A protein has these predicted regions:
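NTP/phosphate- and nucleic-acid-binding module
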Residues: 1-513
Length: 513
């Protein structure tokens, strides 16, 4: 099945089974805005809990904060967002479609990589176990030709972005013969800049109102509070501050479902270190964050680092953790060495000292910062993409199952009475009442037991319990496992011990120790 078709099925599945709804749907929706439904909000909360506990619970020197969305507008002047938070945009005159010039070029680079991979896949199929991929990539003329084109384009693109040379970006689009995905033509306008921040007015009347912004990132709320946290918490460098919160960007080209939205949620941690040690801490956090992702069990081959050649104005090192989505490897987390740019800028614009006094060296300095930043929505999407599975069963039927990590699944256990009579529903409710304080349970009595199993498979419930007539006699139930569909008979008294450890966030956190 084509990857594009797989992605469409995932999007449809999210709506059909209560994970993600188009926002304001009865009013025909609002472009690139989505609501998390009953199962989606549970999965999302579990993702956030996994991240939060991995940061704050497992590290004595990391604490949390929840800063306001509205902040003093000068903060965004200091951070560079007012002057430099822009996207390069280009219009196609025939389709009237507006695109990000950098994304068009990135997609072209990805096409060269796809051509290389197709050659590799064909050769692997032809040669079987004797296939040497490394040797093939080094010697095959078609692979080498596409690699040369990719590398040359990447180098030219990186320089144009670093210089923010808009004319060169357009010339690259022309030279690469990139066409509009709607009209199929190359009738492009010039590239121009567009600021991404949402602005609004704060105040009782237009005469005395203040222009404020919906924050485009959560990091600045940490920076302006870092000294308050350090002093009240008696923190010593190195230490970190974690935050989960909404951010807003006026993306002109929002696309790929919840991957790129105008309202999104971030999980960020800013780690404050002594100047000169930041490049020692950067690789440590780089590896720690990759371990966090891989603890989910999605396979190391589905992740890769993408080190930045073009660095943001505040960074001296940066990398992305990319995950293999149906539409290619895409960023799910960024790790940046932000230097002391942000804190120095806030000192300059506020006129107040926010230097840290180091009692060990008896000196004051502005700390450097290592940042880890995850988009919760992208993380959610990556998990759904990997979990969505279609299986052919022996009877010829197709089973759709979400193979979610048990600790992240919205519901951990479904309790199903075989029939809706003879005391079986009451016994099922009794089991739920004994377990609901430990993990999320659901009750379902409608349709055949087979159909109920399929419904639970589709929402990723790792365990199902069937209550039957034998349950009333010997207090045993049939426990079914989602991924294997295997069943075993266990005592009701054993359920908590069998299930709890496997569905707790602690089961993931222990992999990080």
């Amino acid at each position: 099945m084509a990857q594009e078709d797989v992605f469409k099925k995932i999007v449809s599945h999210c709506k059909e089974y209560g994970f993600v709804f188009p926002s304001s749907e009865i009013y025909d929706g609002l472009a690139a805005v989505y609501d998390y439904a009953q199962n989606g909000v549970e999965l999302k909360n579990n993702i956030k809990e996994y991240w939060w506990k991995s940061m704050v619970l497992l590290h004595e020197n990391i604490v949390g904060i929840d800063s306001a969305i509205f902040m003093h507008p000068t903060i965004w002047k200091a951070s560079g967002h007012v002057d430099a938070f822009n996207d390069p945009l280009i219009d196609n005159r025939d389709s009237k479609k507006r695109s990000r010039a950098d994304v068009l070029i990135e997609d072209q680079i990805a096409k060269y990589e796809e051509k290389m991979q197709k050659e590799v896949d064909k050769a692997r199929k032809r040669f079987g176990e004797s296939f040497d991929e490394q040797m093939f990539r080094q010697t095959n003329p078609r692979v080498l030709a596409n690699q040369q084109k990719r590398d040359a384009l990447h180098e030219r693109f990186a320089k144009a972005m670093n210089d923010m040379n808009l004319d060169e970006l357009k010339q690259i689009i022309i030279d690469e013969e990139i066409v509009c995905p709607i009209s199929g033509t190359k009738n492009w306008t010039d590239v121009r800049q567009f600021n991404l921040m949402f602005a609004t007015e704060m105040g009782a009347s237009a005469d005395n109102s203040m222009k404020v912004y919906l924050r485009p990132e959560t990091a600045q709320g940490i920076f302006v509070n870092y000294l308050n946290v350090q002093k009240t918490g008696r923190m010593k460098i190195p230490f970190g501050i974690a935050q989960i919160g909404k951010a807003f960007r006026n993306e002109i080209v929002a696309r790929q479902f919840i991957f790129r939205m105008r309202e999104f949620e971030q999980m960020e941690m800013q780690f404050f270190v002594k100047p000169g040690t930041e490049l020692e801490w950067f690789p440590r956090w780089k590896e720690a964050r990759m371990a966090w992702h891989q603890a989910l069990g999605f396979g190391a081959e589905n992740y890769r680092f993408h080190d930045h050649e073009k660095l943001a104005h505040y960074a001296n090192a940066a990398t992305d953790i990319e995950f293999h989505m149906p539409f290619g490897f895409k960023e799910v987390e960024g790790i940046h060495s932000r230097t002391n740019f942000d804190l120095s800028q806030h000192e300059k614009f506020s006129g107040k000292s926010i230097k840290y006094f180091d009692p060990q060296t008896n000196e004051s300095y502005t700390p450097y910062v290592i940042e880890t930043s995850i988009g919760v929505d992208r993380m959610f999407l990556s998990i759904m993409c990997h979990a969505y599975t279609e299986e052919q069963l022996e009877n010829g039927e197709t089973r759709v199952v979400l193979k979610l990590p048990a600790a992240l699944a919205p519901t951990k256990l479904a309790v199903l009475p075989l029939v809706r009579k003879d005391g079986l529903p009451e016994k099922a409710r009794e089991i739920i009442d004994s377990l609901k304080f430990h993990f999320n349970c659901s009750y379902d009595e409608k349709d055949t037991i087979g159909k109920r199993y399929r419904r639970q498979d589709a929402v990723g419930t790792p365990y199902c319990v069937t209550v039957d007539y034998d349950t009333l006699k010997d207090n045993t139930v049939t426990l079914r496992f989602r991924d294997t569909m295997e069943q075993e008979r266990v005592s009701v008294d054993q359920l908590l011990g069998i299930i709890e450890d496997k569905v707790s966030i602690a089961s993931l956190l222990k992999k990080l120790q």
